[in-house]
Structures are given as C-alpha cells and as structure tokens.
Regions:
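Multi-pass alpha-helical transmembrane bundle typical of ion/small-solute transporters
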Residues: 1-148
Length: 148
C-alpha cells in the first residue's frame, strides 16, 4: 500500500516537474516538505499494518485515520506545489492550456477522495484501507496528455 502511494506521489511530482521552466526557493521548500512526508509515510503505514485486524476497533480507527491524514496532507502539498508553480509562472511558456487543465484536474480529486475515505475509516477501517489503495492505483494510471 505504501509503495503504491509513494509511486503515485512520485508520478504526480514528475508530471509537475516536466512542466517547470524554472524553480524558486519557495517551490524548492514545498518540494522538501513533500519529501519529508514521503520519508514519514512508513510510520503511519506500520501503524496500519500492526493494528488493523489485531486490536480493538478504536485502535484500528486511530491507525487508519492517522494514515489517511498523512495521505491527505501529502496530496494537498502536491496540489499546492502545482498551483504555486502556476501562480508564480514557473511553468514553461509552451505548456498548453489543455495540458495545464488536465494536470490540475488530475491532482485535485485525490483531496476529496481522501476526505471521504477518512470519514469512512472512522466506521469501517478495513474499507478505508482498500479505499486508500484504490486512490493510489488510480493515480498510478497514465495521464493521457496530447503534446502539440
């Protein structure tokens, strides 16, 4: 599960950097924060693996919610990275509007999905774990962008 999530974050990050013309200090710091969350991800993943199906439902919920919040923050930071690059005009001038819109729309749904799955996890932790994996698999699917 963690591997798929890290892979999805890496693919999203790679898609963003493909469109960058340059970077500034703020973008680099946002990037470092994203790297910090990726490095932190094994901790909540371990909590899920240790406490789901092993302990009380309350402990399961805490572990799954903590994992989901980590994923939500990671997805929000990835989206913020992209929106910051757009807002500060760090994106290549030859990037087409269709490409920019597609990537923006591709990065945004994960946020809403994570919020819904976190809420589901409060009642059905195992279903939430499956949901987190499904979101990661969705983001592992190729982005279809037509280059001009």
């Amino acid at each position: 599960m963690s591997f798929a999530t890290i892979g999805a974050l890496w693919l999203g990050h790679n898609a963003i950097t493909d469109y960058l013309d340059r970077a500034d200090t703020t973008l680099l710091r946002l990037n470092l924060l994203l790297m910090l969350l990726v490095a932190f991800l094994p901790f909540p993943t371990r909590l899920v693996s240790e406490y789901v199906h092993v302990t009380t439902a309350r402990v399961e919920r805490v572990a799954v919610t903590f994992y989901g919040l980590t994923l939500l923050i990671s997805a929000a930071l990835l989206s913020l990275l992209w929106r910051y690059a757009l807002h500060t005009r760090l994106v290549r001038p030859d990037a087409g509007d269709d490409e920019i819109t597609l990537l923006t729309h591709r990065l945004t749904p994960g946020l809403g999905a994570y919020v819904v799955i976190i809420i589901v996890g409060l009642f059905l932790p195992v279903v939430a774990v499956i949901g987190y994996l499904a979101v990661a698999v969705f983001f592992l699917l190729p982005i279809r962008i037509r280059r001009r």
